[in-house]
Amino acid sequence: MPANNMISREQAEALIREQVVPEIFQKAATQSTFMGLARKLPNMTSKQTRIRVLDVLPVAYWVNGDTGFKQTTEQAWDNVYLTAAELAVIVPIPEAVLDDAEFDIMGEVTPRVIEAIGKRVDEAIIFDKARPAEWDAGIIVRARQAGNNVANSSDLYAAILGENGVFNKVEEYGYAVNGVIASRGMRAKLRGLRDDNGQPIYNTTMQGATNYALDGAPMYFPANGSFDKDRAQLIAGDFSQAVYAIRQDVTVKILDQGVIQDPSNGQIIYNLAQQDMIALRVVFRMGWALPNPATALDGDRLGCPFAYLAPSTPMTTQTVTFTVTTGSGGDTANVEGAIVDVNGARLKTNSSGVAVFNLPAGSYTATIKKKGYNTDTESITVASSAVTKSVSLTPAT
């Protein structure tokens, strides 16, 4: 027998145990950035919750002389509604796959689905992407109508903190910035800021950790994939002004009966019982609002407690022009000072009865009102061209 005979690794491969690390390497599931910063209200007890907000401020007048007449004033309130919208997903899994898996598939899928819910919430509320029809316009759209968008600039410091910068836009309406959301690429831009002598402004040492904050307001860099760099580079605002409430917390249910159907054609995709499958169903319902009450600096509620730094190529919007008149036939007149509310974004008509919005593609509901006239409601669809809308208000009787 040769002295160099041996059992090689190849010959014994079938008997060698392969070490399997009982862990799946993945990032910790991240939740909604917006829900971590905004103010949470008590859970909703129905699909819609009403918030009363100050709409008209009282005015004080000087009295002329000892026998002067004291003038009267008014104060009014408006209703802002939180409407619960539903997020849901179904994950079908064959039972054979569950039986053969080395990991708890259900335990791995659930946190990723919850992260996906957080991403959708942030996209809809902050960036107005895939927004439910019953929700108000997102923060970016509201800020845009208030003029709280700042063009991209090579002088990043001035664009954010200087006069007419992002922070100043918020402050002009009487709010103080208490939080900033930015793309992850903004970290490098801030670290690269230099003064006239070439010294770093944002961090003083390359070895120490950088404390990301602006004018005392902490910065957050969403890791759930929701931040849209094509719509904003940075968003700053008073997050205490934004509120949300939960109608149904994240509910996970495992189904082993029923069918999954294609809603477009009615075709059955999966029959759980017949195909030995289960389905993980996750449901979440919540509503949000930006009440934007009247303040001493914004009595008409035309402002927004948020502002943003636009990307080099601003997001595509179309002008939506409302012309508000009263009367009929040849006896018509422009209505100046009418409030046009498009999904929460408000503008006031000028002396020509005109209010011009800049809106991304989507469907909107407009409410036009003025004291002494009946309120009018219009539906608006924005696509790839400008939209004009003529509105005729009738005097209240």
Residue ranges of predicted features:
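Assembly/oligomerization interface modules of large self-assembling protein complexes
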Residues: 2-89
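Short, ordered, surface-exposed loop/turn motifs in non-cytosolic proteins
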Residues: 318-320, 328-344
